[in-house]
Amino acid sequence: MRKHYCSLAALLLLCGAAPSLAASDVCKDTEINILMETVPDTVAVSNIKSEFEKAYNTKVNIEAINYSLMHEKLVPSLSASSGHYNVLVVDSYWVGEFKTAGWIAELDELIARDKIDTGVYIPALMELNGRVQGKTYMLPFWHYAMGVLYRKDIVDAPAFREAYKKQFGKDWEFPKTLEEFAEVAKWAGKQENMHGMAMAGQRADPVVMEATNYLFSVGGDFYDRATWKSTMGNPEAAKAVNIYADLLKNAAQPGALGANFDDVANTLKQGKAIFAISYLFLFPTLQDKKDSLVVDKMMFEPLPGKESFLGAWGWAIPSNAPNKECSWEFLKWVESKDAAYKRALDGGQPTQAWIYEDSKFLEAWPMMRKVGYAVDHSKGLPIMSRSTQLVETFAEVLGTVLADGAKSEDTLAESVSKFDRLVKGDPLLK
């Protein structure tokens, strides 16, 4: 894992002790409203929010809903003269839209005033969900690094290793390329009489988040990020879509074309699939002894190939928040050393680098040992004003190929002009 060190003094500045009672006056007679996604990190915040409520004599209202509903619910509030939400959690591919629309407040003056050192964060996450064009608008909250979730009990079994050697003529090692991985996943499903893959092909976000891994793995991208000309007509894009389509047809669980990440988690929890190219944040669900059959049987491996997809969420203050000082106190508290560490131990996905070197954390979540490598070999969607439209456009391409059976090369070639239009005149890409 790449080392991201910060001085102890800097760490204590960011991660200081609980606020004094005097500081709590800024939240007096105020409630904090936050809209969040139904994921383990939201649960981790909910489990400790009473500490802030007690220290600041206030109430934190967390409204947790399905991701697909969040954007449409946030936009009317953010567009109003006075909004309902005091704190925002911003998905990485909303960053460009929210910044361009002026919906999130710049934090640099507050950071300087309170001597907050953002150097404790993994740099890639700070660039993805922290700064935009050199100014800070967010503090990274949690990431959704992706890679291969797999059944270690099956893959490590001598019988599997022997069968693999007989099939492929070599000793077992984790595949080095996406093409090799796809062949192994198809073979393993037949070998074990299971689904080789658990997949999420639902439009728009699930299939795009999943398939973007395939695109990045084979060296493709949506654009040449120097010229901002679309590269979706290149051979790499067709290769990625073809591999994805092949696995969806020949290795995935029934109904995968309409599945989301909850369905992937359920397929894995029920012990019905060997592999998934999916989110690390699913592990707390897979470790839930109440309804998972794969407790302590799953492990994580970085995606084979060149790069994987990296997404993240950041804490932000709405520009129309009624009490920005109280909102800022919440951001400082929730990203304090104590709160961030408690969230991590509770199954959250930490953004502060020091946590990944903590022995207690790694003992509780051993699959997180390879997160540093995964983050260092990943990238996010471009920070652009029309990133939501980018996702919709790629989802349209994938739907045409996966559902309608169109040839990927032709569909992708036709999409190039659509992708080019999305970046035309974008102020964030100058």
Give the role of each language-model region.
Residues 1-32, 111, 420-430:
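Short, low-complexity disordered leader/linker segments with a strong preference
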Residues 29, 108-121, 162-174, 197, ...:
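Short, solvent-exposed loop/beta-turn-alpha elements that line the ligand-binding surface or hinge
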Residues 54, 79, 134, 154, ...:
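Extracytoplasmic/periplasmic substrate-recognition and gating elements
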Residues 180-188, 220, 225-258:
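Glycine-centered hinge/linker elements that transmit conformational signals in sensory
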